Amino acid sequence: MTASYQPQLVFVDGSFAELAQDMASVLQISDEIQPLLDSEKESEALTKIVSESKKLNAIPEKEFTGAYNLLVHLVLQSKEPKKHLPTICQNLTRPVTSSPQHGAQLALFELTSIFNLLKPNDPVRFNVFIQIIRFYKIHSIPISDHLKSALKQLPRWLQSWELDEEDQRKMYSEVIEVMTAAGEEEEAYQHILKALRTFDSEDAEDYTSEEAQQLALRALRSAISSPTRLSFEDIRALPAVHALSESHPVHYQLLQIFGEQDLDDYDDFREEHEGFIEKENLDNEVLYRKMRLLTFASLAAASMQTREISYNSITKALQIPSEDVEMWAIDVIRAGLVEGKLSQKKKVFLIHSVRYRVFGEKQWRQLASSLEKTKKTVSTLLQTLRREEANAQQEAERKLVEASTQHNNDRGNQRRGGNRGQQHRERNDNDD
């Protein structure tokens, strides 16, 4: 947008005085507004109109949108829209008494319109968007795809509004609360991580603050308790989360188990810290299932050299009966941790590929070894192809020589045959 950008509502036309008087009529305060307009006290007139604007929530439903459009237009065309918009937004979060059925949607539409009418880099958008987020929670509105789409742009918006880290966390906190209340756990989790990234990674005092540690704990609990979250590299990479190893060592130990250890380690943890899982309101059944899937993945990663795991190894590591191996193999494949198939005949799981839980020095060595094997295989294949190509070329050349020789021989025979015929005719002529 250019600096000359001016917001404009459709179907709103007229001078300030004319439009202000129209608004005053709707609010039934014309007697108070007209003297101010006559005295050219437009700012005072607008302040009075905005202060009375809560009455718009009680006007007939069919007039609601038009009236609010007019009010918003007056405010946006004024010298101080920032002064008046908070009041309007606050009014819109209140119930629309004239329309119990459609009031929430009408008000949300108006809030969204205000946001869209502001310049993209206008910091006032920050407060309007917070009101939109809160509106969803206040009125228990299901999270729309439109809002989810808007949230993808939120980091860019926050940057364009030039907000400090505290205000950025304020916004993310609002989103987290709304998403949590709506049962959108994954959305909430992702915004917890975004909030944690606003802490200065080079300032220990910042990322070890009480606020940072509480957010880190919330992220940890969310990551561990989620039935579908099977990757923990994103959360473990955050300094605020790593700092939990000092401030909340038991929590951090549990995260480490889910990040890179196995079911036996989880059992040892529960024995060592009896009652901790229950105290944290974590579902042990969900956690146990996750650890079995993660243990299967670790087993597959450790078996990449042979590319197979015996049924016995699976039953022992997962602590399951042999008849359940197929079920867990299917589950780990569906979870995207491992690709492979069962061999009922050999009683093994054949590994095609595996998603490493941790990619460290050991995994780099394994990758280097695998690449070296691939390199040797490709080199051998190229040598074979070149050898076969050379043999084919030699064979083609040999056949070409043979064909040329045969052609020359045939021509020679034809010439010799022609000479003998001519000599025979000459003898016959001489005989005569």
From Swiss-Prot:
Q: Which InterPro entries match?
A: ARM-type_fold, COPS7/eIF3m, eIF3m, PCI_dom
Quote the subunit structure annotation.
Answer: Component of the eukaryotic translation initiation factor 3 (eIF-3) complex.
Which GO terms fall under molecular function for this chain's record?
translation initiation factor activity
- Coiled-coil region: none
List keywords of the entry alphabetically: Cytoplasm, Initiation factor, Protein biosynthesis
**Biased composition, class Basic and acidic residues, residue ranges:** 392-401, 423-432
Give the domain of life.
Eukaryota
Where in or outside the cell?
Cytoplasm
GO biological processes: formation of cytoplasmic translation initiation complex
Q: What is this protein called?
A: Eukaryotic translation initiation factor 3 subunit M
The region called Disordered is annotated at 392-432
Family (UniProt) = Belongs to the eIF-3 subunit M family.
**Name of one Pfam family that matches:** PCI
Cellular component, GO, one term: eukaryotic translation initiation factor 3 complex, eIF3m
The entry's function note states: Component of the eukaryotic translation initiation factor 3 (eIF-3) complex, which is involved in protein synthesis of a specialized repertoire of mRNAs and, together with other initiation factors, stimulates binding of mRNA and methionyl-tRNAi to the 40S ribosome. The eIF-3 complex specifically targets and initiates translation of a subset of mRNAs involved in cell proliferation.
All copies of domain PCI, residue ranges? 184-356
